[in-house]
Amino acid sequence: MRGQSLLTWVLAAAVTCAQAQDVPPWTEDCRKSTYPPSGPTYRGPVPWHTINLDLPPYKRWHELLAQKAPALRILVNSITSLVNTFVPSGKLMKMVDQKLPGMIGSLPDPFGEEMRGIADVTGIPLGEIISFNIFYELFTMCTSIITEDEKGHLLHGRNMDFGIFLGWNINNNTWVVTEELKPLTVNLDFQRNNKTVFKATSFVGYVGMLTGFKPGLFSLSLNERFSINGGYLGILEWMFGRKDAQWVGFITRSVLENTTSYEEAKNTLTKTKIMAPVYFILGGKKSGEGCVITRERKESLDVYELDPKHGRWYVVQTNYDRWKNTLFIDDRRTPAKKCLNHTTQKNLSFATIYDVLSTKPVLNKLTVFTTLMDVTKGQFESHLRDCPDPCIGW
């Protein structure tokens, strides 16, 4: 009986969200004049921190964690509570704490040692830090956009939507984990020899990267891709000893840190075996250098590129293959395209991209931050977001 009630609630919620996708107040006309960020959809700036790559991996995050450890403990405790709600025996978390630390040596450098350093400084068990990093392989719902204006200038924008089904606060209509991630959101300037190697926006405690750019070379964001051959299978294979695939957040960071051109980045992201199916959204600095790479775990299915000579002056990627319809209760693609077409190619700027990313349901209850990247000018900025009621849950 309880199962029937839950199913009825889920179906009712789905129908409500499906209807809300198409009608105000959960959708709206394309926003204008939202930039510079202000007002009720703007939570505040994302703080900057430097990560010194010349330090041993174990020590790189210590200075940042001295400030952010309490907030990280709150988030990890929330995730643990959610897991224990579904597995009340506590056996799953016991396995996490007992089994995962033994696998730290199988992680590629420098990620294992960085996680070990994070665990020691925060006092959070190493197994939970590892699971916290796995967690980002599975729950990333995002919108990414690359545009090219009439002069061939490229811009890259993204909304980071995270935390779906990870605890709903009925008192203020927010996702628990989404809200707890906002104090942990940081801009990171990764430096070597006191010079910037790359910049990224990420969450404290996570050593992979999901959003970043290499000034003057390329920009990169990652969106989750739903597939039957999904990330859970990749994680299980890794836990049972198969180590031939890379974690998606690790390969993104590795490309940002080590790759020296747009074409090299595209080649790596297209061919490397990965643990979870994803979309890599990659932008460069020259006309036509922008693409969405649709990945299965072991192969690339599609590389969809800018083609301004034939009228394709933007690419938009949410969490669905471009050749398929979106899920009927989650269509962010259509309003994003509508607003870009309304903007027109001649009016592209940080301001107009931010307007698109501020329009419901592209902006929704899962949106943690918005990032804007200009590779050519070396501009990178991120802003914490809110979506006050009435606002769709995803």
UniProtKB/Swiss-Prot annotation:
Disulfide bonds: C30-C339, C387-C391
Keyword vocabulary terms for this entry: Disulfide bond, Glycoprotein, Hydrolase, Lipid metabolism, Lysosome, Secreted, Signal, Sphingolipid metabolism, Zymogen
GO BP term (any one): fatty acid metabolic process
Glycosites: N172, N194, N258, N341, N347
Record family assignment: Belongs to the acid ceramidase family.
Function of the protein: Lysosomal ceramidase that hydrolyzes sphingolipid ceramides into sphingosine and free fatty acids at acidic pH. Ceramides, sphingosine, and its phosphorylated form sphingosine-1-phosphate are bioactive lipids that mediate cellular signaling pathways regulating several biological processes including cell proliferation, apoptosis and differentiation. Has a higher catalytic efficiency towards C12-ceramides versus other ceramides. Also catalyzes the reverse reaction allowing the synthesis of ceramides from fatty acids and sphingosine.
Protein's recorded name: Acid ceramidase
Organism the protein comes from: Mus musculus
Source organism phylogeny: Eukaryota, Metazoa, Chordata, Craniata, Vertebrata
